[in-house]
Amino acid sequence: VDNGSGMCKAGFAGDDAPRAVFPSIVGRPRHQGVMVGMGQKDSYVGDEAQSKRGILTLKYPIEHGIITNWDDMEKIWHHTFYNELRVAPEEHPVLLTEAPLNPKANREKMTQIMFETFNSPAMYVAIQAVLSLYASGRTTGIVLDSGDGVSHTVPIYEGYALPH
């Protein structure tokens, strides 16, 4: 699961491309009762939130590559597992991505949610730029990662992002 400021990408190891790519947004109805008879939900995620944005208040739980709203991020992960990938997270090890300067407390919170909320059997958090470099068959190099909310230039040596 690649958590981006603008888009979330998710899929399975071994696949050539993500199975799901959708906006990293959570929307809630601006007014109660506006959507009467439409089976109104208390929140919408991704493409559904985008398509109903006219009557919703949209929130972006990832700002500049860093998760800032954990309740909404949990909704995005729930949507990823159950609606997009259609898997039981307790049956699959999970690989999550993070920004190069993601605070340690954030990584700990991601881990806690995966184990305690989604009962994931195993997980790993990897820096996005390192995974991009791996995809090119290299372990040492420099990656320019230009995303929707933040861009990073990341020097990587033998698989480790160098702080600079």
From Swiss-Prot:
Q: How is it modified after translation?
A: Oxidation of Met-35 to form methionine sulfoxide promotes actin filament depolymerization. Methionine sulfoxide is produced stereospecifically, but it is not known whether the (S)-S-oxide or the (R)-S-oxide is produced.
Keyword Nucleotide-binding assigned: yes
Listed EC numbers: 3.6.4.-
| Transmembrane regions | none
Which InterPro entries does UniProt cross-reference here? Actin (IPR004000), Actin/actin-like_CS (IPR020902), Actin_CS (IPR004001), ATPase_NBD (IPR043129)
Query: What Gene3D superfamilies does the entry give?
Result: 3.30.420.40, Actin, Chain A, domain 2
Compartments, record wording: Cytoplasm, Cytoskeleton
GO cellular component term, pick one: cytoskeleton
Write out the catalysed reaction: ATP + H2O = ADP + phosphate + H(+)
| UniProt modified residues of type Methionine sulfoxide | 35, 38
Its chief place of residence is cytoplasm
Keywords annotated in UniProt = ATP-binding, Cytoplasm, Cytoskeleton, Hydrolase, Nucleotide-binding, Oxidation
Protein family according to the UniProt entry? Belongs to the actin family.
Q: What is this protein called?
A: Actin
Lineage at the top is:
Eukaryota, Metazoa, Ecdysozoa, Arthropoda, Hexapoda
